[in-house]
């Protein structure tokens, strides 16, 4: 099969293999320990989330990751958004659609994005990174997608079916995308794990993604985990710049990619190549062999190496080793 050369002017990541993460880490919120922290806590200035974000940023940089996230410290990927979106109710870890979904009046995760950016900027200086190294770095926003949010929620009133709710949810989330672009995010990753389940009308899902990406100059990505056999040909046509999928924990997906790589023309591929569902260090030789298949399919300049999914359920020492495998292989192939 001939190697496809992709061109997308929006994605200026360089012609080399880069590394990123998909989302969360298992870093727990911490109670104030030092005297200074306790004083801040007593006057309402202690922010445990900032501590977790800082720890997550440093962890990723220690492991050589290029495009980092904030660690998603606020928990549930659905609840962390719907708590702030009019039309949703969130109680007992359950999301319910109770009225028409409307755009929030405030940003949701942009504060965390900006704090992660500020930590990254300081660390670039502290670590004495070269100009070339610093150019590769950046923070992306992880945004739970409208199809996943609505399919994770119970319909209680107003909507008789989910599809109109998905479209309204996309309009509600559009503000977050625009704010991320203004804040200088490296890109936005829309998390849509439900797209591989067969439960979602993919035409509606595509329309919702178009609402989020239309007119945005910043690169836009979409993460879809699970078995791609029944959805890859459709999701490869979504109006995104980066399609991120799992290939380590699912032995079907690499064959699906190899058979359909031509559909990714104009896109980059987020290549999940360490297993986020297993709390053990991956075999580096097996990961390397998998990455080599990905490179043969789409070319290293079109790939971002990352875990299959978030690493919240993986012990931190093991998560670090998984990420080190990614950065070691990126250096080797570059």
What is each residue range found by the language model?
Residues 1-334:
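Domain-level signal for soluble alpha/beta catalytic cores
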